[in-house]
Amino acid sequence: MKAIFITLEGPDGSGKTTVGTLLNQKMTEAGIDFIKTREPGGSPISEKVRNIVLGIGNEEMDPKTEVLLIAGARRQHVVETIRPALAAGKSVLCDRFMDSSLAYQGAGRDMNMEQVLQVNLYAIEDTLPDRTYYLDVPAEVGLARIAANKGREVNRLDKEDITYHEKVQAGYEKVINMFPERFMRVDATKTPEEITETILADILRQLA
């Protein structure tokens, strides 16, 4: 069985974390040799950067600082976690990757998406996902889910208003148009179990 790099993307409240947990279980049951990781984070240094970027109290952070910090964390994650796993024949399941930077920082912060893309391509070099699952849900539905989930850890980006989250969604649409061959859009208004089964079936096809 070949090793592939899989990423989960979607706006806040799309159910990505829940689906990631279920997918981890189902992929293990299917006998797939893989690791599960996340961004920002995924390595000791990158997790420290995550705490800075998402920490409540860092609202004054400049948008370009945000881009550069996340790109730096991503570089370390690629070098320390993702590439070694792929080289060892293990697939990688990652909660967010470069596309999040394009949507959240590029579009959400009204930055030049091409510049954000180039910064990230410099960081990751040739380590692009083989398959990206975009969990598609309206911004208002996602934010309502966040508000209803009292046990969810709230980060700095969750506190942004609906306009920001709508920009993020529009940004994702641009990213999907940039890389249509690796994206699969998944209806995230369905149950986590239904979403997981849809994604797992496609992963098994990709690995065949």
Curated annotation (Swiss-Prot):
Molecular function (Gene Ontology), one example: dTMP kinase activity
Catalysis: reaction(s): dTMP + ATP = dTDP + ADP
The organism's place on the tree of life at top rank: Bacteria
UniProt xrefs under InterPro entries: P-loop_NTPase, Thymidylate_kin-like_dom, Thymidylate_kin_CS, Thymidylate_kinase
UniProt KW Iron-sulfur keyword: no
SUPFAM superfamilies: P-loop containing nucleoside triphosphate hydrolases
EC number: 2.7.4.9
Binding sites annotated in the UniProt record for ATP: 10-17
Keyword Nucleotide-binding: yes
CC terms in the record's Gene Ontology section: cytoplasm; cytosol
Record Pfam families: Thymidylate_kin
GO-annotated biological processes: dTDP biosynthetic process; dTTP biosynthetic process; dUDP biosynthetic process
Record keywords: ATP-binding, Kinase, Nucleotide biosynthesis, Nucleotide-binding, Transferase
Family as reported in the entry's similarity comment: Belongs to the thymidylate kinase family.
NCBIfam families: DTMP_kinase (TIGR00041)
Protein's job: Phosphorylation of dTMP to form dTDP in both de novo and salvage pathways of dTTP synthesis.
Protein name: Thymidylate kinase
Source organism (scientific name): Listeria monocytogenes serovar 1/2a (strain ATCC BAA-679 / EGD-e)
Source organism phylogeny: Bacteria, Bacillati, Bacillota, Bacilli, Bacillales
